[in-house]
Swiss-Prot record:
The gene is leuS. It is found in: Cytoplasm. One of its GO terms (biological process) is leucyl-tRNA aminoacylation. Its EC number is 6.1.1.4. Keywords: Aminoacyl-tRNA synthetase, ATP-binding, Cytoplasm, Ligase, Nucleotide-binding, Protein biosynthesis. Coiled coil: none annotated. A motif ('HIGH' region) lies at residues 42-52. ATP binds at K579. It is an enzyme of class 6 (ligase). GO terms for molecular function: aminoacyl-tRNA deacylase activity; ATP binding; leucine-tRNA ligase activity. The keyword RNA-binding does not apply. This is Leucine--tRNA ligase.
Amino acid sequence: MDEHYQAIQIEAEAQAYWEQHQSFRASEDPSKEKFYCLSMFPYPSGRLHMGHVRNYTIGDVISRYQRMRGRNVLQPMGWDAFGLPAENAAIQNRVPPAQWTYENIDHMRRQLKRLGFAYDWSRELATCQPDYYRWEQWLFTKLFAKGLVYKKTALVNWDPVDQTVLANEQVIDGRGWRSGALVERREIPQWFLKITAYGEELLTALDGLTGWPEQVRAMQRNWIGRSEGIEVQFHVEGKEALAVFTTRPDTLMGVTFVSVAAEHPLAREAATSNPALAAFLEQCQRTATSEAILETLEKEGMDTGFKAIHPITGEAVPIWVANFVLMGYGTGAVMAVPAHDQRDYEFAKVYGLPIQQVIAPKDDQASCNLEQSAFVEKGLLINSGDFTGLDFDQAFAAIAEHLERGGKGQRRVNYRLRDWGVSRQRYWGAPIPIVHCLHCGAIPVPEEDLPVVLPERVRFDGIRSPLKQLPEFYQTSCPQCGGQAKRETDTFDTFFESSWYYARYCCPDNNATMVDERGDYWLPVDQYIGGIEHAVLHLLYARFFHKVMRDMGLVRSDEPFTHLLTQGMVLKDGAKMSKSKGNTVDPQALIEHYGADTARLFIMFAAPPEQSLEWSESGVEGAHRFLKRLWRIVAAHVEQDPKAALTLKVKDLNSEQKSFRAKVHETIAKASDDIGRRYTFNTAIAAIMELMNALAKFDDSSPQGQAIRQEALEAVVLLLSPITPHICHRLWQELGHREAIIGVPWPEADPDALAKESIELVVQVNGKRRGQITVAVQAPREEIEGQAQAEPNVQRFIEGKTVQKVIIVPNRLVNLVVS
């Protein structure tokens, strides 16, 4: 055995063995317990970053451990390949998005293989391939038939120069990121999925996801946002009534105006005869559409001149256009109660609108100073006519009954969750399978004509989607009447692809159906791993898709992911690694210098998986030194005739040998719990390092000493093999084994080795530590007392004194009370 640790050579040999023997290829085996471990697949940006490496190392350690535990493990990998970055790169590099994407996939696949991840590459998929997105197009047509798909106009950010829709993050200071043009808010037709039809189940089923972090479940609960309230009708003379939803009907008597969005029909009608209002609406059109951006804007508005009739008092209140009301949320109209809503309060202060207090604190503890801010707490009604004196619950019931009796409102359950707009006016995405016919309307593409293939050889300049400029793509015939028709040129939101990929891994070779019976064997995913930034959108959409697929008979389970682990970020100098900060670390350079095992060991040792990991060069070097030390210790051991028959005779061991062997099996027990149950991989590694330190001090060259050392080294190599699989692959062979470690089960702690014959007890005199004794586990009380009083240092403190009482805390201490 070479005494020097040659990481690069060792890792190449191990990876060649795994590939040659297809060690990680998974197949269904009903006789074995399955374990499906999945890390969120990457966007093929070109190079792995340390966040990728951490995510995938965690998943690989879990997968390898479960394999050693006898589970039938599936760990696949693929590519979330559609999306905006490919379009941006196409503009910058003057290559088609497809070419850029496929080249990146090839490079990143090589990087993943170099890290030794135990993936079943036979199941690899890329979402930009027609044989993948064909099935989401098929699913869309089925949802269309079930009434879960519809089209309506929705607000988008429009770049008038590039003639394209911009994502919110592409709007910088109100201008398009590329053209610099002032961005407009436009209403354009968009396709939506009725995720709200599953809102109640998505909410209530969260209680059953006990393997998910509570933080993620809370984020989804808040996003779904179930609220009970009243839909109130404010009549407008000569117009349709304004429907307004409120969760605070107790404040209804304090309404002093109604706010509507700039896109509301009433606002547009008023603007036809009011040039100043028309200019204001145009100004609002140039504001980005996200809630977050609108929250930060200075509150602005204009009076429409229209009046709404208060449903209880009959008073007329003005209708204002406000820049913070979004048409895409609710009805695009909100009742304004400045005394009890801070946003309305700020708006009313700016425009001198009335502030009418109708809620007072229940007690003197709550402060209410309307000169400074709104009073937003619940309390008792004042200035509210017949409802004065009621508390919130009483007022809710009384006002609801009053409105329902008069046909001016009704109780409703509302959700913050909105239907999912899946249209994107972009090129690099899966085409939406709809044909537009002048006679028949929007018609889904028939199943036999799927997939609608995205043309990949296009010239992409970022100005309009190439699909709109390709007659050979959009010119078609109507599937229903055969007449001339136009193909939909919008593409799917990329969350569409990532909402069901986990299921396709079960049967990526099936060209006849989206998910086959193999899905029932593998699903749900047992362990899912990814960043908490995906807590709401991706994880919610995947849950929605899974329930849709269940209702279509494609899967049997109710949820896609049983357990969820959200790993922390990788930091350097206290900040998240990013190119803009110039604090990135190239995984490739790290691997080429130290080897993949060093990178894996550092990542798993530096922090628990759910916490942020601070990058440390010294930590990486320390991990490398540990592996070199392990290599040297094994090399020194095997030099002493490793092929000799070392038979461990437990009954013949002396006390020192028993003590060291107990340490070995304590480490096995701790690592098993830390890796298998607690996922505190760093503490498992720390325990293994402690065992290595004890091993270095274990100076026993007797045959039994050698046998114990062999057992200890085998345990260390097995315990480390999920974390540093390459070096362990080689060391297992050097320790005299012909079979590869990849097929060896996880070690079990020997209960007999853990059963201690003696224990150490602290001896106190009047509560102060004065010594320590070793006694037999079953030693009688008299023997323990005698040994404690005979301990030399203890004798100094009890000499000439009377022992009045002896307190023994089992397995911990003896306290001598003297006077």
